Amino acid sequence: MADPYGWIRADLESLHRVGWYRTTRTHNGLAGPQMDVDGKPVLQFASNDYLGLSGDERLIEAACRAVRLYGAGATGSRLLSGERDVHRELEQALAGWKGCDDCLVFSSGYLANLGTIPALVGKRDLVVGDEYNHACLRGGAELSGAVHRLYPHGDCSALESLLIEQRERHRRCLICTDSVFSMDGDLIDLARIADLARRYGCMLLVDEAHATGVLGPTGAGAVEQLGLTRSLVQMGTLSKALGSQGGYVCGSAELVDYLRNRARSFVYTTGLAPAAAAAALEAVHIARTETPRRALLRQNIARLRAGIDEIGIAQLPSDAAILCLWVGDIEATHCFAGELFEEGIFAPAVRPPTVPTSRIRLSLMATHTEAMIDSLIAALTQVSSRFS
């Protein structure tokens, strides 16, 4: 009888064949702009820790206090034995920061979308999303059983055409989009999308994972920066600029109450570890009040962008802390990243199927120094000269 698991080997071989095979690399040391990767000291330009808070002593102390007070884990679903006062304090802090009535915290950002979208729509409904939406937005849409339609990246005219064609055929419609796109760094035209949602009677879910802590007067994200006041669903993560772990959904009190009862990835899973919640709560306070930290991040972004322009490497348009470089096909991009690593820079290649075209993805932190940025620019200059 044939091996029922034999297909796995064939699939792995196909990943190797097309250059899509990936492995993990071990990072050691305190989270920050300098780490050891596979035993080699490098400058870290792949982390989503945009404000440099993950290794901040205040977050570490908050997490340690929570462990001593509550123990290592939440021990159960928050609807059973897993609710702690720090969960509610975090939700109230996030809701206040985001300008919403209430908030619900999940165990990860992925779970937040995987639970929220199927709770809002079902088989009689429509989900419309940007073709470059994060996998958890697309996964949530597919899991819901709703009709799922994608429009070309950033094309609001195509979005409107889809709504004209499809909206009247369905009971409810949910528009899903990232605000800042994780593999490009560009900010979408949220004001136009919000207007289309209003005109066509659609719910709107905005994933602020890469905008929270980075954009807006207080760092609350693109929704704050653009001054959007229309009722919408603000989703985000605690694991990027906030330096901890977990996800959240902010919105009306009624929406949050509904999700608390209907979002399966909240109801049927263990609550966020109290230590992660406490660290995130401290991070919200820091991100909201320490505006110089965001100013440092913006300076680093501008310095690196200018350096890349001077070298002449093609880069994608970006509005955030993510800069993506085009250096060739899959093989060339992989080799380019390998040579950067030899120069002491960790900036791995991002390849299909994660993105449609291979690229070097650089992410910046407020804690990168000017000297670190200049070291990256020097390494890019050296490596690109060997590839030209």
From Swiss-Prot:
Q: Which reaction does it catalyse?
A: 6-carboxyhexanoyl-[ACP] + L-alanine + H(+) = (8S)-8-amino-7-oxononanoate + holo-[ACP] + CO2
- Cofactors per UniProt? pyridoxal 5'-phosphate
> What functional role does this protein have?
Catalyzes the decarboxylative condensation of pimeloyl-[acyl-carrier protein] and L-alanine to produce 8-amino-7-oxononanoate (AON), [acyl-carrier protein], and carbon dioxide.
Q: Which UniProt keywords apply?
A: Biotin biosynthesis, Pyridoxal phosphate, Transferase
Residues modified as N6-(pyridoxal phosphate)lysine are K240
Q: Which GO terms describe its molecular function?
A: 8-amino-7-oxononanoate synthase activity; pyridoxal phosphate binding
Name its GO BP terms in alphabetical order: biotin biosynthetic process
Binding site residues for pyridoxal 5'-phosphate: G109, Y110, S182, D207, E208, A209, H210, T237, L238, S239, K240
This protein's name: Putative 8-amino-7-oxononanoate synthase
Describe its assembly: Homodimer.
Segments spanning the bilayer are none
Specify one Pfam family. Answer: Aminotran_1_2
UniProt: substrate binding residues: R22, H134, T354
InterPro entries on file = Aminotrans_II_pyridoxalP_BS, Aminotransferase_I/II_large, AON_synthase_class-II, AONS_Archaea/Proteobacteria, PyrdxlP-dep_Trfase, PyrdxlP-dep_Trfase_major, PyrdxlP-dep_Trfase_small
* Record EC number: 2.3.1.47
Name the pathway it acts in: Cofactor biosynthesis; biotin biosynthesis
Which family, according to UniProt?
Answer: Belongs to the class-II pyridoxal-phosphate-dependent aminotransferase family. BioF subfamily.
